[in-house]
Amino acid sequence: DCIRAEHTVTMIAPKIGLYSADGPEYAGDLICGNLYDRLDEVIDDVDHAAEIVEPGDLVDYFAPLPTNIDKYSRGSVLIVAGSAQYPGAAIMAAKSAARAGAGYVAVAAPDACANLIRMALPSIPVFAIPSDSRGSFGAAARMTVCEIAKKYSCVLCGPGMTTSAGAMQVVSGLLELDVPL
């Protein structure tokens, strides 16, 4: 057990543990106290184990988008994922691809969970692929998924698929394609 602080005062510099693992959950608002007026002069020469990166630090890494850009010029991603047991994996993968900047995202999932994924992702197309009796990709899934995958810039495959025979056939088929996986 650990005390959940509303505020934590750390001296000289922020500590890694306050920003990683369970640290943020227990630390509360962080305040960095200064023990030495010219500390910046001293620690500028020291190698740091880590740096705190805030959203504003990343702005220069992303070029402004042209005004005439469309969704297909930012790449298309097919998410081959999910099963009746793990539909959330496909949902999270599709949301992540869209948030990361993919121009067009679609999901190919077993028909046993396709409607659930459609309800969670109304703006993302979902292909319902034949499933087996356990709600994973069925024996007929390989050819269907591979035909769909050929139309995309890249494929994300795996989250929540389980290790059924049909799922393994889908993965084998995708590995044979000339599409980044």
Positions of PLM-derived features:
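Small-residue (G/A/S/T)-rich helix-start motifs and N-terminal tracts that mark the onset
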Residues: 5-7, 13-181
